[in-house]
């Protein structure tokens, strides 16, 4: 018998002893009629006392190392263990009887009958007895641990590992006893609950059942707290992996469920909630830059609980940060915000993170189509938001340029171009709006250089200009006709703003060429250095080809850009001539003489236009004086110009007329008019009221031209008209100051009509050009429609279906024009023809 005085905290364990007595009654000797066998009763009591001793010697300990170093206690347990194992053997191998029937003898007394109990039942009952004693030890240790930690979700995780190691020591002390039956009677392991668990895993589950009974519904909160304890622990090291024994790892080993979930599923659920709530794991610049570090840490954290969870945990992390449209959209926004600071092109900003990593993540999950869809949706949403209900093209192109700058590898550039053209109606309209946007920014940058950076050296000014130009990197910049849009704009501005004081002539025109070449060279010369190409070849190989154009396209582009330079030189020469004449001869006249071949076709006239209308006397004298001076000068000098004839382009003549209206700065408002408008308006210097017939007789203008001019003045309320077709100066005229720029108001001819004259001397073309009727313009529209139609069909279109699709979009073209446009697109490799299916594809 073990001396009961061994316990130093007898008072603490009295309740345990009293509870155990009931267990004894259920255990072996009252149940199996062992009252008459004191030997078995003694063995049962000795086992009970051994468990009692184990509890007494360990309940006050908090550091298992002290127990392991206490040789006296270890010797005590070792000394008693052989006897305890012998008791186990005796109690499981004994014979026991139970009454099964009673009979009356002749004296009316009951006679008991007994039946030998099967050993299987004896063994099971002994294991129940051991489980009951083990449960009492577990309950006592759990209660002591939770009491010390004050049931705190913060303190328990910090002390869990030390408690569990103490628990392992205690269960190891009684291990030979509680494992006696499973080890020696393997045939009944299944009935005991040890089919899939080891004996210690079984008692680990009993440990968690006990803790669950203390926390009830809040048990899952405790488990979450232990997970978050490790999540917020920095850094996670291999040493930690060796020393820590997380609660969830033990639960996983013993298949203990939480809220009906397996430990792994519960961990993934907790991790998912953490990702959503943790601000440091939202799409941010630092998060993307440290992506690999965070992913490695995520893997180490999962391996702390189970190495088998690493793959799923990393998939969850990647899914949260990469595999969704929101993250792609946020990454693009981050790129827009940081591009101005980094000022790097293509690969330079890809060292930390890039959209390619998103793409690779989607591709690894066989979700590449989803990636393209998400990119397309993100681009579409951003462009629509920028364009808005008020159709703000300035904001739209701000967004387009920023999106293109982020997309260094041109992963979603096709989406940008598609949605841009879709919002603006067509490719040609998108290019037209971009030209306006480019020129607007060029004006702003030049003005800023003049005001805030005027002291910089010239090369620094040029560098600043080039760095801040809104360069657009989309495929339509490759169109051979792309420079033509700029040519038309430059030509038009040169005509409208040709005077000595014009900011366009003084400041913009001198830098326009270099600025455009900075834009154009993006299509001719790649910014990828050989060093970068070699460095990133493996990772970026699929995209390198996007930076280079086919040889045929390159040759065509160079020809077009050479043609642009020639056009630009002609503009410069014309402006130089006009400046010289303006300074030396007439301050009010600025002549521009162009080579006919260099004038954009939409502005050209087929034949010479004779002056079959009447100019105001002063203007007529100035014009005739110019002709005399020009011919006389060229005749004397025997220049090349003497061999050429002058063809006046009356429809393009531009006049500035000073009005009597005073604006806010105290100066007279200046009207910007066409020559024909000027001829009409100057008549009102002599009379305030003129009839249509009188105006027609004095100007000799054709009725269509005259009607359009008068309508333009009425639209701006400069003139009024009565029921007798009499036109008068509007005495109460007030200009719309929103339309006044630099003290000038341009009176625009109505767009709804065409200025044409059928005078006998020739044909005159209006300055309100309807470019869609021009053959060259029709070609561009056809090419844009063909490209868009083919692009929208994944499987391509055959010739007939393609023709019908384009025919639904634009009208008024011939089959020959359609075939020419199709042939040019095939030549320039904007589309291809699949010979096997006879279809055209993008």
Swiss-Prot record:
InterPro entries: Cullin_homology, Cullin_homology_sf, Cullin_neddylation_domain
Outcome after substituting residue 791 to A/R: Prevents RUB1/NEDD8 modification
PROSITE patterns: CULLIN_2
PTM per Swiss-Prot/TrEMBL: Neddylated. HRT1-binding is necessary for RUB1/NEDD8 modification of RTT101. The modification enhances ubiquitin-ligase activity.
Required for interaction with MMS1, as annotated region: 1-50
Comp. bias regions, Polar residues: 755-765
Main localization category: cytoplasm
Pathway: Protein modification; protein ubiquitination
Similarity section: Belongs to the cullin family.
Its job: Core component of multiple cullin-RING-based E3 ubiquitin-protein ligase complexes (CRLs), which mediate the ubiquitination of target proteins. As a scaffold protein may contribute to catalysis through positioning of the substrate and the ubiquitin-conjugating enzyme. The CRL associates with CDC34 as the E2 ubiquitin-conjugating enzyme. The functional specificity of the CRL depends on the type of the associated substrate receptor protein.
Keyword Oxidoreductase: no
Signal peptide positions on this chain: none
Chain positions covered by the region annotation Disordered: 755-775
Known partners and oligomeric status: Component of multiple cullin-RING ligases (CRLs) composed of 4 subunits: the RING protein HRT1, the cullin RTT101, a linker protein MMS1, and one of many alternative substrate receptors belonging to a protein family described as DCAF (DDB1- and CUL4-associated factor). Component of a RTT101(MMS1-MMS22) complex with the substrate receptor MMS22. This complex further interacts with RTT107 and CTF4 to form RTT101-MMS1-MMS22-RTT107 and RTT101-MMS1-MMS22-CTF4 complexes respectively. Component of a RTT101(MSS1-CRT10) complex with the substrate receptor CRT10.
GO CC terms in record: Cul3-RING ubiquitin ligase complex; Cul8-RING ubiquitin ligase complex; cytoplasm; nucleus
Glycyl lysine isopeptide (Lys-Gly) (interchain with G-Cter in NEDD8) cross-link, renumbered residues: 791
Subcellular location: Cytoplasm; Nucleus
Phenotypic consequence of gene deletion: Delays anaphase progression.
One GO biological process term: nonfunctional rRNA decay
GO molecular function: ubiquitin protein ligase binding; ubiquitin-protein transferase activity
Name assigned to this protein: Cullin-8
């Amino acid at each position: 018998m073990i001396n009961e005085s061994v316990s130093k905290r007898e008072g603490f364990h009295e309740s345990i002893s009293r509870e155990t007595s009931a267990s004894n009654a259920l255990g072996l000797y009252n149940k199996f009629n062992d009252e008459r066998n004191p030997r078995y009763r003694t063995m049962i009591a000795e086992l009970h006392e051994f468990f009692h001793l184990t509890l007494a010697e360990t309940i006050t300990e908090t550091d298992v190392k002290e127990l392991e170093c206490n040789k006296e206690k270890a010797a005590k347990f070792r000394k008693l263990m052989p006897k305890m194992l012998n008791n186990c053997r005796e109690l499981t191998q004994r014979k026991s009887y139970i009454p099964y029937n009673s009979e009356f003898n002749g004296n009316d007394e009951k006679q008991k009958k007994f039946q030998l109990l099967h050993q299987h039942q004896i063994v099971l009952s002994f294991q129940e007895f051991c489980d009951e004693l083990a449960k009492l030890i577990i309950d006592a240790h759990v209660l002591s641990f939770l009491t010390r930690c004050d049931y705190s979700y913060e303190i328990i995780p910090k002390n869990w590992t030390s408690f569990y190691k103490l628990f392992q020591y205690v269960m190891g002390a009684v291990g030979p006893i509680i494992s006696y039956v499973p080890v020696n009677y393997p045939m009944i392991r299944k009935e005991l609950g040890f089919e899939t668990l080891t004996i210690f895993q079984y008692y680990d589950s009993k440990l968690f059942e006990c803790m669950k009974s203390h926390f009830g519904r809040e048990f899952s909160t405790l488990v979450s707290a232990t997970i978050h304890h490790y999540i917020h622990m920095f850094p996670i090291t291999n040493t930690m992996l060796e020393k820590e024994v997380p609660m969830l790892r033990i639960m996983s080993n013993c298949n203990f469920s939480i809220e009906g979930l397996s430990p792994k599923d519960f961990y993934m659920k907790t991790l998912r909630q953490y990702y959503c709530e943790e601000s440091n794991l939202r799409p941010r610049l630092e998060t993307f830059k440290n992506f690999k570090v965070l992913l490695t840490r995520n893997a180490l954290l999962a391996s702390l609980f189970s190495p088998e969870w690493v793959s799923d945990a990393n998939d969850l992390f990647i899914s949260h940060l990469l595999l969704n449209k929101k993250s792609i959209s946020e990454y693009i926004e981050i790129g827009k915000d940081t591009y101005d600071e980094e000022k790097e092109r293509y690969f330079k900003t890809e060292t930390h993170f890039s959209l390619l990593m998103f793409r690779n993540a989607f591709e690894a999950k066989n979700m590449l189509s989803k990636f393209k869809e998400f990119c397309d949706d993100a681009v579409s949403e951003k462009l629509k938001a920028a364009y808005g209900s008020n159709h703000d093209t300035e904001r739209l192109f701000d967004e387009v340029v920023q999106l293109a700058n982020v997309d260094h590898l041109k992963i979603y550039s096709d989406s940008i171009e598609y949605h841009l053209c879709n919002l603006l109606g067509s490719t040609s309209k998108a290019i037209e709006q971009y030209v306006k946007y480019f020129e607007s920014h060029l004006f702003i940058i030049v003005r800023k250089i003049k005001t805030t950076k005027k002291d910089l050296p010239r090369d620094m000014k040029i560098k600043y200009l080039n760095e801040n130009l809104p360069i657009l990197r989309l495929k339509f910049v490759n169109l051979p006709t792309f420079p033509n849009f700029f040519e038309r704009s430059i030509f038009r501005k040169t005509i409208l703003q040709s005077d000595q004081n014009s900011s366009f002539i003084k400041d913009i025109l001198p830098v326009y060429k270099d600025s455009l070449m900075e834009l154009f060279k993006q299509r001719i010369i790649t910014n990828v250095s050989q060093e970068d190409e070699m460095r990133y070849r493996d990772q970026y190989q699929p995209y390198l080809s996007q930076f280079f154009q086919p040889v045929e396209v390159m040759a065509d582009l160079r020809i077009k850009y050479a043609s642009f330079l020639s056009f630009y030189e002609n503009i410069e020469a014309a402006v130089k001539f006009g400046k010289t004449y303006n300074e030396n001869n007439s301050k009010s006249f600025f002549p521009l003489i162009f080579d006919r071949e260099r004038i954009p076709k939409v502005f050209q006239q087929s034949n010479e236009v004779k002056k079959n209308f009447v100019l105001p006397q002063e203007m007529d004298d100035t014009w005739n004086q110019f002709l005399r001076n020009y011919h006389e000068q060229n005749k004397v000098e025997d220049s090349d110009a003497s061999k050429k004839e002058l063809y006046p382009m009356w429809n393009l003549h531009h006049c500035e007329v000073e009005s009597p209206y005073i604006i806010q700065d105290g100066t007279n408002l200046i009207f910007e008019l066409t020559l024909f408008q000027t001829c009409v308006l100057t008549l009102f210097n002599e009379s305030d009221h003129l009839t249509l017939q009188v105006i027609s007789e004095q100007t000799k203008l054709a009725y269509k031209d005259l009607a359009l001019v008068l309508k333009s003045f009425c639209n701006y309320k400069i003139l009024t008209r009565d029921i007798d077709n009499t036109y008068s100066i509007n005495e109460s005229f007030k200009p719309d100051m929103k339309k006044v720029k630099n003290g000038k108001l341009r009176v625009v001819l109505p767009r709804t009509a065409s200025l044409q004259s059928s005078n006998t001397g020739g044909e005159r073309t209006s300055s309100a050009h309807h470019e869609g009727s021009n053959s060259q313009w029709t070609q561009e529209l056809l090419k844009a429609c063909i490209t868009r139609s083919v692009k929208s069909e994944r499987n391509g279109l055959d010739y007939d279906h393609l023709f019908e699709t384009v025919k639904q979009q634009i009208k008024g073209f011939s089959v020959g024009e359609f075939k020419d446009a199709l042939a040019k697109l095939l030549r320039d490799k904007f589309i291809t023809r699949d010979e096997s299916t006879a279809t055209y594809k993008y």
